[in-house]
């Protein structure tokens, strides 16, 4: 595509320069510098975008770039100039040589036909027929022959048509002058263009303070009040807000300031009249006059001390006197003219006008017209502040006296003092804005209660300057003129202007000329007032610097003080190198407001972890604990000044925002010494109370990525060297250190720790009497011992936090899946913890064999009692007593109706949350009648298609489905039309809108004559009255990229055949779609450009339109249709409304339409009809009566610049009405569910799918079935797990559904299986005592566990250990009564857990035992072969195998499960049985009857059973994203107070502060239980010797730890 060097060697750079003027060359150089920066080369991308424009086809642009000499390095400026001169001012001979060079060979001496045809195919897509004449004599031609042929065939191809035929369409310079936004505003106001440019910067800074993004009354009010009274703020806002949209745009504030401050007196009084005309009816009623008088008297009292008669008169008398003297209509009100006559000589009205004058300049940013005016404005503001006195919470600013005196001379400031009363710069003294000198006292520092001086001006303003420039509607030099005074003052902040000032005071002979007019001062220089900081650290606060203490600064001699509004104005007008804000506070002793000049200067340290060596490693399996040989290094990072009255909480919040660190991830420590730090955790303490003085060191601690705290980890690592300081705390209110993403463990431990019966069991040491160190599936008692030691520390009441090192190590040893530093599932850890505690404390040391029988139609109570008895024979512990309940699971065959029932134990209920099966969609409907768009809210199925969306939306908005066109709008244009058969997408490139389109009618032949009535009524503009047999003509042509809402009769060929070189000619013979796309467009002018086509670039804005257009639509109809839709955006003011414009010279509405329609391509930038080399922005559509043949093009609505600047209401673009369905759908989407609904869903009947066929023992085959779970027995401690992590559609997702649950008196009895009281009998079903040696199971009645092996991998299906059985983890094969719950969608080989589970848990490991997880497909088959072969083994083998595999699996780190078929097979069911509860109410486990509770009576048990009411005592909450996030616990202490356990932090809080929305696990305790009844008797029992356990632990501990 061209050579690497320029092909324009025939035109030299020097010759090209002679053809451009100096002005043009400077513009080109500046444009090149703006585009390329300091580089001498322009990239190809910049060349295409900035020089040629986006309308040139990419292939053509690439050819031109290469022909100019562009390479991969770029295009040199000299080559660019030569190329531009050739294109715009080259001679035909030179252009012919250029075209020849494009096709010539490397040598440039001839053109080869094959090469030329190849390039023409690339550029034009075809080869002209006349080309064969050029090569009639051979395959090569020289320049002469090529030139002769080219001049005879100038229209042969694109380049020849562009450069040789039809004249020049692009020039080097564009002399047209489109008015800029500022020029337009300056033409209709009394403001200069420079004033408007300067005012715009201020406007965007003020608007940036809005919370809504609009300059509304909520934003405007605090800015002007005080000094404007709140009663007048709304009226003043309305006076600016001409279009009454509750938003002051820049045009309105410019015109309002012009009318209020720069116009003649009569016009200024007009503005005041609008302030008092509340109802905007053009007159002041009696009520409005009374309110006006009240407001004016308040203004007078605030600003003047003079006495006037009106102060002593009755309000009604004043109103009557005004009406009697000036009411010309004699109807009891004042017109505008009446008000003007009254206000001319009225002192109250004039004083109000003076106040507005001050506010408009100081607050709203208008620059004073003269220095004298500036001095009067500032003086008036300071006089009023002197009457108010110092107000706590306000900031005052220090200004160097040297600059202040120079400014006073410049503005001719009156030197008489302005006294502020009371003054508190000195204790009880007064200060004035005069020359009186007062020293600063050093004895008592004055401090700020405005944290960090966040309201100061300098930083906030500098951060927002860019937004002001971006808002400008002209680019290049249109916004900021570097030579204007306003620009210099706003951006030249750092230079010292004293030299300039001295020069201004010297005459030509060197004599001082003090009598001359003083020179305008430069930027405010406060540097002499502050000390040079020796500490080189970043300051986090904006106090500006520490004031000098020596020599002593004296007020009135060294500095002056001004209130914040005055400082902002001076800063805006002059700039400053240093802002010195100082706040006003109340003295804690005298309660007198005072100004703090010397706030506390604090030094902040940050941790810098030391580099670890191989010897100083981290703890293996323990967390990120550093070595004691590598202590944490702390370095000075920041400084900051804060008030002594500031609380720790306020400082913490400020630092969090300033450093962009989450509050929960940062803590503050008081640094006393290297080894003595104090955590500042009491947020209500003030610096004064803590006796924190200047230059005190504080440590900013930030969490590690693994959620541990560096200081804590360092303390743990050095705990042998540093004495732990005992701090008395509430028992149980002790946190747990995060050892590296162990918040999941801490949360579960805290919940279990606050289970009072279990905690009392451990605190009393009873666990040491029941340690089972011989249990093959236990943990040798280590789990119980470590947990017991930790509980005793937590409830000792001597430590604020402890590190659970031993328990963490024990868990990691026996469950490696919890090892490492990744976030885990708190529920999984809880299950493992309870399981480990149970096995270590199991009172059954030799487990007997039990038999699992089929229900065979037996009563539920009998089967349940049998299952419970079987479990109790093998499992007895404090964990079983407290946490275990029983579930009934029944499966009903849909073929024969046979019901199979089994009962399983559970220790927590896992309730699947209903996943969001609906998506919430809000869509805006835009109608053709121009009414305000309406937003509708819908709830759609997740797989809903746009067809269904149309139907639902049609029912809401009243349009037929055929009238709705969906479009994705992005960057003010339509990017895509979704097809009806596509699924609705929430994440689209833009936002989805629904446009109304004309109803398609029956198709009409384009060739047949159509009789139409072309007359149109004014209401329809002739757009919808064209009929053929009473119907609208059916659209039969669909342009490229448009939706097939209507059936096309044409083909795609109609479109593509018409495209030649990017040129789309008119297609008058092609039918239309019935509508076309219209986009709003404005021209953005730049003064730095390369070609005339790029001086004014189109820019799209606003919302695109859908305009009706058929084969019969006239051009005038298009204008009418567009105006109908946009008139609400550009409505002229009501004729009776007084305008704020100084002179309304806007004639944009004088003609019919304030815009012009042009035919453009889909991108809206270039013409759809003209070829690219014409550089046409769109052919104009005349507003005439002839037909509008638009074809498949779009139209651009080009707004007249004056109308756009003065009449177009940008804020109205975003105005939509919200239909009631929006709130309804939002509420439905976010509506929480209650716990009862979760339980109801859990116990509801479900149908098993075809992939979950149930093997029916009656039908002897797999059948379809239904399944139902029910609660049979509830434990004293009920744990409810809300399954937020679920596997849906192949991926893990977290449900954010809010679940409402009761805290007190939770009654789940409605979900218990009803009992038949006639069958209840207290019949012993188990032998008395602990000896089960005589219990044997016949071999013929049991089935073996099927062990499936595949590729060397072993999948063993086992029973869960008793404490690991959750309600939803029912461990039976598909179709069995205990198969997985319907609502818990699962993934293969994964347990019902979070995706944070270890890979060891989720996958198969060779040589390891793997347990099937919930929903797993790897379950025991129900096939007949398995059933038959399983009869060979006996129950003894089964139980032996189960115990062995359980032990091996626990040691491997996973939770065991046993899954066996119910029919004819054994299941090691974890059920309880009490002899007396075979038909009990099932409300509670009550007390065990076979070992230590023989003395309990049946009456006590019956009482317990009759109260299944629970109270909440602990919550584990998960916040954040899936796969991460954070766990915290809320628990109720025995002192009846709630505490928040956030790792090592434990704080008391009010119950209403609990974050219940993120609840994950709920812990309920049954009302009325006696903790003592669960404590076993230790009489006659021997405490276990744990010395060997300690030795074992220490031995293993040292293997994993490098600490000594």
From Swiss-Prot:
Family named by the database record: Belongs to the peptidase C19 family.
Residues annotated with Cysteine methyl ester modification: 1601
Entry function: Deubiquitinase that can remove conjugated ubiquitin from target proteins, such as RAB7A and LAMTOR1. Acts as a positive regulator of the mTORC1 signaling by mediating deubiquitination of LAMTOR1, thereby promoting the association between LAMTOR1 and the lysosomal V-ATPase complex and subsequent activation of the mTORC1 complex.
E.C. number(s) listed in UniProt: 3.4.19.12
Gene encoding the protein: Usp32
Native source organism of the sequence: Mus musculus
Protein name stated in the entry: Ubiquitin carboxyl-terminal hydrolase 32
Biased composition (Basic and acidic residues): 1491-1504
Membrane-related topology note: Lipid-anchor
Binding site for Ca(2+) 1: 241, 243, 245, 247, 252
Catalytic site positions: 743 (nucleophile), 1526 (proton acceptor)
An annotated GO cellular component: Golgi apparatus
PANTHER family according to UniProt: UBIQUITIN CARBOXYL-TERMINAL HYDROLASE, UBIQUITIN CARBOXYL-TERMINAL HYDROLASE 32
Modified-residue entries (Phosphoserine), positions: 1350, 1372, 1376, 1454, 1588
